[in-house]
Amino acid sequence: MTATPTASLPPLANDRFLRACLRLPTDVTPVWLMRQAGRYLSEYRDTRAKAGSFMGLATNPQYATEVTLQPLDRYPLDAAILFSDILTVPDAMGLGLSFAQGEGPRFAHPLRDEADVAKLQVPDMEKLRYVFDAVASIRRALAPAGAPGRVPLIGFSGSPWTLACYMVEGAGSDDYRLVKTLLYRRPDLMHRILEVNADAVAAYLNAQIEAGAQAVMIFDSWGGVLADGAFQRFSLAYTERVLRQLKKEQGGYRVPQIVFTKGGGLWLEAIADSGCDVVGLDWTMNLGAARARVGDRVALQGNLDPNVLFADPEQIRAEVARTLDSYGAPSAGSGHVFNLGHGISQHTPPDSVSVLVDAVHSYSRQQRGAAG
């Protein structure tokens, strides 16, 4: 993507995140955390108890708004991310999503044969109205009485491949045996699933943008389980199909697009050339090496090991400094969004997040002062 946005930034009290995504100068490195609204927060657990179930929480715009804002009320984070789940799209396709206590997501009607695949189609987006209502509700809560928004709101979806994994396996998997069997035995059926998924994800993200999402992120959580060659054909090609269809701006403002492939370091250059604005990195990557490989043609997001947050405060600060030093001093046309290399653990001490966020802002401000 080009470094010069074709549209301006929306009026926000804090637009660091959007500026970094578009590789524009920032006063400090912006920070937000994957799963920042989650079980590590006592207030989240209280709201979850009121909702009665995870889906009761995710499908209620009022509750979704409440939990989206909870980490922002605790920490000076630079972005909000919609509280939802990546599996809402296949649920709207009729696969029957449920969350069993202690077992994670499960589909009642997984895709197992040609007849199942033949019935698959892009769902009516009205079935996902609760998501778009939540986006609009969160935006209103972030900007009460017409004031500038506190921070931008990120919408998201799972990637076509990651959704397909759940849709074929019927649940999470340790060996991906069912989905890879289908991929190798009947690649025609796998491509059909991925085509439908890509068009569904594009429609879903565009609807989030229309509802008020100011950036969108594609989570390719299972992309890294594919072999070289298979990743390009069955994951990246369909992520690119999504990106080609996405709105690049809304209401005259740029809408940055982030792609995160867990375990995707081998294909960093190809992901950077996919058409996204930002590439998310897991904790196995060296930020400086990644920046050297892709140059400044995209911004980078990441990539602290989430388990660093179980260390003592001094060690957290040291690891934050190491990560920021690894990326290097910001320069014209570069962009870095600090994040974890994967979602935050439910067991994380909340005080550790305070240490992390403060360390990112303070150390990156020092970096800019030294560079200046």
Swiss-Prot record:
GO biological process terms on file: protoporphyrinogen IX biosynthetic process from glutamate
Location of the protein in the cell: Cytoplasm
Recorded catalytic activity of this chain's protein: uroporphyrinogen III + 4 H(+) = coproporphyrinogen III + 4 CO2
Swiss-Prot/TrEMBL keywords: Cytoplasm, Decarboxylase, Lyase, Porphyrin biosynthesis
GO molecular function terms listed in the Swiss-Prot or TrEMBL record: uroporphyrinogen decarboxylase activity
Top class in the EC scheme: lyase
This protein's pathway: Porphyrin-containing compound metabolism; protoporphyrin-IX biosynthesis; coproporphyrinogen-III from 5-aminolevulinate: step 4/4
Keyword Calcium: no
HAMAP family found in the cross-reference section: URO_D
The protein's role, per its UniProt record: Catalyzes the decarboxylation of four acetate groups of uroporphyrinogen-III to yield coproporphyrinogen-III.
Subunit structure, as described in the record: Homodimer.
PANTHER family linked: METHYLTETRAHYDROFOLATE:HOMOCYSTEINE METHYLTRANSFERASE RELATED, UROPORPHYRINOGEN DECARBOXYLASE
Protein name, entry field: Uroporphyrinogen decarboxylase
Lineage of producing organism: Bacteria, Pseudomonadati, Pseudomonadota, Betaproteobacteria, Burkholderiales
